[in-house]
């Protein structure tokens, strides 16, 4: 979910997919097995120097004002470098993902807007739903996978995410590694592909883009050409090895989004960097074809996973 490779003038894409010897019985998301040593030293990412930072009182987060009334809420002190997005309309705001739940994201949101806030997750992995329990108006995809994950994640499954290796800095005082967990949350409305959210003068459309997980979505602002893309694409290893992943389904989702590229101006990924070029989806599609056709060999890494690097 993160990487040491930076975007330069040429796209660098690394995929991590399940090898034939990967055990489908593996429990949890074995994150730390692929953390690069010294990842903290690669920070800050250069893109942030060119963005307007907004001061907030909760220092776990960094907030950046993007174009078109969008705020990127970034967690740089944890190795996932997760990014949630607050999107403002005239009458409502939408929070796309709620992060790891290490810092209280609701405190940040309340400083950025007085509008009522609806929450929608790009998918229900733990690093995207950590702050859901802080909100009452939650939309979620109507899938069995989603319904299973509303119960949250136990300390056993997520405690490595706040281990020394996973952090670049100190935890908030209220976080105890022995008791840290992802809380359960209540969904107000279950939704499906094509659902539209009216924020007042701004319409967002939910696009079902499964593959990384069965409930993965992208969020489209067609009028402005913006696409919040979750974990489908970002600057880093794109995880396609956990049991809930389906490579063929993921490819179909990427192909769907590639058809939209002519109408897009900006991608907002969920990790590492808040801005990516829509044309990056073409490179991702090509990489997936090469993996599926066996025209490139992967390198076996921890857990029997295969790593593919594309430039």
Short names for language-model regions:
Residues 1-8:
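N-terminal secretory signal peptides that target proteins for export/translocation
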Residues 9-16:
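Sec-dependent signal peptide recognition
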Residues 14, 24-55, 252-311:
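Accessory terminal helices/loops
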Residues 48-60, 65-66, 93, 100-101, 141-207, 213, ...:
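Metallo-beta-lactamase
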Residues 57-111, 219-234:
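Conserved beta-strand hairpin/beta-sheet module of binuclear metal-dependent hydrolase folds
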Residues 67, 74-76, 123, 142, ...:
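Residues at the C-termini of beta-strands that transition into short coil/loop
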Residues 102-196, 235, 280-297:
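Active-site HxH/HxHxD metal-binding segment of metal-dependent hydrolases
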